[in-house]
Amino acid sequence: LQTSAADVYAVGDAIEFPHPLTGKPWLNYLANPANRQGRIVADNMVFGNTTRYEGAIGTSIAKVFDMTVASTGLAAKRLKQFGIPYASSTTHSASHAGYYPDALPLTLKLTFDPASGKLYGGQCVGYDGADKRIDQIALLIKQGGTVYDLIKVEHAYAPPFSSAKDPIAIAGYVAGNIISGAMPVATWRQMAEADRCDTLFLDVRTREEHAFGAIPGSVNIPLDELRGRIGELPRDKEIYIYCAVGLRGYLALKILTGHGFTRVKNLSGGYKTYATATAPIENKTATIRTNGKTDTQHTGERIKTLKIDACGLQCPGPVMKIKQAIDSIGEGERIEMVAT
């Protein structure tokens, strides 16, 4: 932090320093690095230049209404800007064990070197637990860690706080499978831009899930039926498989490769990522609709409401619950469902 003038040091948000991962000058407008710089400069002024500032990778977090968004290191956009080859993984986990109440969605994206697995960056979005996951990833990046080190992190585990396989461990396993070639992946952008004459989109979710939304033109063969219906799939096309978040897609990929299919990829992050990324941005105005049946204020009638708690259920659990409810209710009745 000593400048070209021997008695002048530079600290704070306005100074440039080499990024630890790229070596290129950059600015980091965060209070934590600025305070550390102040301590380092004070020590160096008193004791001589004994401590070198290693730089900051830009770990940040923000509260967006009831959600938390956090980031550390280099995101895909910045890696493209610097021309650094990278791979990425997207995983959807839960803030803690799904069987324990109030488990909430947590999405993690990693960027890493496609050969060595060196971690470049991480992004996390969720309602609970995003902060501690991004802190763990940031620590590993600062230490030059890899995606394989994510698997080795020893975290405090009990069902209210995490899962036996923590979300960052899951992200590490998925990234490792991508690097090793055990799971070739396609991104949502590749799916959206694919040549439909040479590709087949295979949805291995249940029929009920498919009916709630699917990638246009995809063929629905549920995972449980796949082995018996492999003959329906073309071997002269590239097959992009997807499920809700990626796990069933991975299992389907293994089934197909075991039967000799070679041009098969799994959608990274599943349909949840694709649907979110391609959804149109809408400005909606809240309205109140009445039809004379469901409005107790106007009719004075008490409407029968079926309440469903689907919290903690893994896909396709919530979809199956609501399907059963729809089949059982009568005309004018209402469903209230809570799911994570």
Language-model features and meaning:
Residues T3-A5:
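Rossmann-fold NAD(P)-binding glycine/threonine-rich loop
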Residues D295-T340:
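Domain-level signature for proteins that mediate thiol-based redox and metal-cofactor handling
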Residues E16, T206, E225, G312:
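Short, glycine/acidic-enriched loop or turn micro-motifs at the edges of active sites
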Residues K118, P234-E238, S328-I335:
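Short, surface-exposed connector motifs at secondary-structure boundaries
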Residues Y148-P159, S163-R189, E193-L200, R207-Y240, ...:
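Rhodanese-like catalytic fold shared by cysteine-dependent sulfurtransferases
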Residues A14-D128, P159-S163, P167-E193, T199:
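Mid-to-C-terminal Rossmann-like scaffold of FAD/NAD(P)H-dependent oxidoreductases
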Residues A10-V11:
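A structural signal for the hydrophobic beta-strands that form the central parallel beta-sheet
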Residues D128-V147:
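A short, polar/charged loop-to-alpha-helix boundary motif
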